Amino acid sequence: MHWNPFLFGFDSNLKLVSILEKEFIFYRNLESRQKIYFEKRVDKFIQNYSFVGKEILVNYEMKALIAATYVVLTFGMRNYRTTMFNTIIIYPSTYYSTINDTYHKGEFNPRMKLIVFSWEDFLSGHKVKDNINLGLHEFTHALLFHALKSKDASAMIFHEEFNFVVKYFDNEDFLNALRVKNYFRAYAYTNKFEFLAVLLEHFFETPNVFKSEFPELFERLKRMLNYKEIQ
């Protein structure tokens, strides 16, 4: 039995709808009832998480783009919200982190319950389909942390499929085959956590190529996210 979000009323926010129609192919491809579901989740995200600008004024469109990126990633999950972060900090561009004395484009800090983005890099990742998407990347880290800590059904499936992904990562022959294909960027092979984050960037940015080149791995990620392909 599937939970039906459409049993509950929700009035569409016209400003939000305009942003989603313009900026998200994923949203445009949904059926009308699914669009309402998507809008409701974006609206709830904006209401439930704090957005803090550092040397930048955060407007509604910025919040909507960030929230919708998270909703794209979690759209198939019944339990999609997480307590692994409560605040999203936005810098105009790359920022200096005192934690490891280096410049960052983005990060997930579970101890401080923060997601941090360089807006310049977030926007570039959103606009350009080059398999580099900062929003998807950092939110994947947060979702994995949630999956490792939580016992809800969505988290358990995510965790279970991550364990399969780790088996791929630990298989040196398989990794060598991936490197030969040169589809995933080198950063994917840093560790198993970055491997998953990069995989999901590719999953959403160039799904047809991913599915064609690595169908078994693609199916694992579909199950992980309870993702339904748009025909």
Give, region by region, the residue ranges found by the protein language model.
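Short, well-structured alpha-helical interface segments that form or flank functional binding sites
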Residues: 37, 61, 130, 134, ...
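A metal-dependent hydrolase signature that marks the N-terminal structural subdomain at the beginning
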Residues: 1-105, 110, 211-213, 217-230
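Single-residue recognition of alpha-helix boundary sites
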Residues: 42, 148-152
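Active-site recognition of the HExxH zinc-binding catalytic motif
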Residues: 31, 129-147, 197
